[in-house]
């Protein structure tokens, strides 16, 4: 807030990451600001985030030409079809309706990805099988990666009628499994601590691995004599991992460990200095590693002065995902710091929050596209993005500085698009007046007239009225409001629309 005693210039200088919402300013200011920014940058390339207020099917269609083959990582958290969600995409769909919601959008999202693109989708037991089947139709069964299990709760539900539901799934597909590989995760302190130098090996700390494997080979089934003279055979039905000749080479190179007394089962020494710079992701993610539902709720609520900025009722219906969970997904699928991430069931904006935080952490330039259709867009998603750009940490809707009085803001340009609905388009069709011709037709003729003539001929000028391009910045449409049957005359940006359609 700018107090009357403050100079606007000094306030701006001391708050360099405070967002300016250009929609709140006159058109002349918007034009001047965008022109100034365009002088130094390609504004489209400099844009960090794109927030689209729209039905996801319409939004994905709009993105096709501009972003085809560019989205490295897709994460969606669609409705779980359980009856517990009160948002615009209502849970408790009939299976067929829910399947249509998903199947209409997955192919469009698939077109936006390169061959090494990765697709993640959160889901629970109710629709996990159906979601995988639908996604397979587009990505192909051969490109299924894994079903990740996420431990979403930190305590059991003792009042559960049957079993305590403590996990969700994250279904994972890639566009081409032959070329996609997961980015390695940072090695944790706990994992690093497991490496010890028990024998003062000059190569440094090491841990030991099993020398036996279950894929049996006669060549690798041989007895091993320990330094103390014990004879060791592979476990029943197994064999050693290496041939006898290779084993003897490893013994000579001090890469086999027989325990401190030299009498134990041989194990392979794996040196910390030789392992990959990171660890391969597992398919079981615990809440200690990636957070839980309550953590996610607290992260979202902390951004708002609940009861004033946003209602308690609205936030109580939210089902956000924890930032640590999304960070894990980004580290696997979008570690490259110029990746583009898409979430077309954006909800409260957790995906954008995670991308902004990761960029803040590693100075990355990742970009994000979020799509959400309900009032949640204006009340939660957009304000949340504005806030996490300005400051890393929040409490009760107030930014929290660190010990050095830094808010850790980041520079961002975020574009906000609002698309008219299909219903709005139909409501703005202007038909030729043919008097009482329609009233004189019988029912069969009326239907034939509607399908074969009226939409094709009488509404032709509405479908692409070239006259509006004489003044493209003044084009308007009647857009439905929250009141039943009410509309409001609003400006439509034809130039921006055609830029997206043309790519």
Explain the meaning of each model-derived region.
Residues 69-84, 135, 341-355, 498:
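Conserved proline-anchored active-site loop of SAM-dependent methyltransferases
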Residues 41-66, 74, 85, 104, ...:
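A conserved hydrophobic secondary-structure block that centers on an alpha-helix together
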Residues 117-121:
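Conserved beta-strand signature within the Rossmann-like core of class I S-adenosyl-L-methionine
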Residues 58, 80, 127, 346, ...:
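Short, glycine/acidic-enriched loop or turn micro-motifs at the edges of active sites
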Residues 72, 79-101, 114-116:
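Mobile active-site "lid"/loop adjacent to the S-adenosyl-L-methionine
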Residues 52, 122-123, 343, 372:
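Small/polar loops that bind or transfer phosphate-bearing groups
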């Amino acid at each position: 807030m700018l107090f009357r005693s403050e100079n606007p210039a000094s306030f701006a200088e001391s708050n360099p990451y405070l967002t300016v919402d250009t929609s709140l300013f006159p058109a002349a200011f918007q034009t001047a600001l965008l022109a100034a920014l365009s002088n130094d940058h390609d504004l489209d390339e400099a844009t960090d985030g794109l927030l689209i207020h729209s039905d996801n099917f319409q939004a994905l269609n709009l993105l096709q030409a501009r972003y085809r083959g560019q989205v490295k990582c897709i994460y969606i958290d669609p409705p779980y079809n359980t009856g517990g969600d009160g948002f615009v995409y209502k849970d408790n769909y009939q299976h067929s309706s829910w399947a249509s919601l998903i199947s209409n959008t997955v192919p469009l999202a698939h077109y936006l990805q390169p061959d090494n693109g990765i697709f993640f989708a959160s889901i629970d037991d109710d629709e996990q099988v159906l979601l995988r089947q639908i996604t397979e139709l587009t990505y192909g069964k051969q490109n299924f990666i894994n079903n990740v299990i996420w431990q979403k709760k930190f305590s059991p539900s003792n009042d559960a009628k049957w079993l305590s539901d403590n996990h969700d799934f994250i279904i994972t597909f890639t566009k081409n499994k032959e070329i996609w590989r997961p980015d390695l995760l940072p090695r944790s302190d706990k994992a690093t601590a497991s490496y010890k130098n028990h024998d003062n090996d000059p190569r440094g700390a090491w841990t030991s691995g099993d020398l036996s494997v279950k894929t049996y080979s006669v060549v690798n089934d041989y007895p091993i004599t320990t330094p103390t003279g014990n004879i060791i055979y592979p476990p029943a039905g197994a064999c050693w991992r290496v041939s006898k000749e290779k084993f003897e080479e490893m013994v000579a190179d001090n890469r086999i460990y027989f325990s401190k007394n030299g009498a134990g089962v041989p194990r392979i020494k794996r040196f910390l200095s030789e392992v990959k710079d990171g660890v391969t992701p597992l398919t079981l993610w615990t809440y200690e590693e990636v957070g839980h539902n309550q953590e996610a709720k607290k992260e979202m609520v902390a951004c708002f002065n609940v009861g004033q900025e946003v209602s308690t009722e609205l936030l109580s219906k939210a089902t956000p995902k924890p930032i640590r969970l999304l960070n894990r997904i980004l580290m696997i699928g979008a570690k490259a710091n110029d990746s583009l991430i898409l979430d077309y069931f954006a909800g409260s904006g957790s995906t954008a929050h995670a991308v902004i935080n990761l960029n803040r952490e590693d100075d990355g330039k990742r970009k994000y596209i979020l799509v959400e259709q309900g009032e949640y867009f204006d009340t939660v998603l957009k304000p949340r993005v504005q806030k996490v750009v300005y400051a890393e940490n929040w409490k009760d809707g107030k930014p929290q500085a660190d010990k050095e009085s830094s808010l850790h803001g980041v520079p961002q340009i975020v574009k906000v698009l609002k698309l008219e609905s299909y219903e709005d388009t139909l409501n703005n069709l202007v038909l030729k007046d043919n008097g009482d011709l329609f009233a004189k037709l019988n029912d069969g003729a009326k239907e034939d007239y509607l399908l074969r003539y009226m939409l094709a001929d009488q509404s032709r000028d509405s479908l692409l009225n070239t006259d509006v391009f004489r003044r493209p910045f003044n084009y308007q449409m009647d857009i439905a409001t929250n009141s039943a049957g009410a509309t409001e005359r609003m400006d439509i940006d034809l130039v921006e629309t055609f830029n997206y359609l043309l790519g």
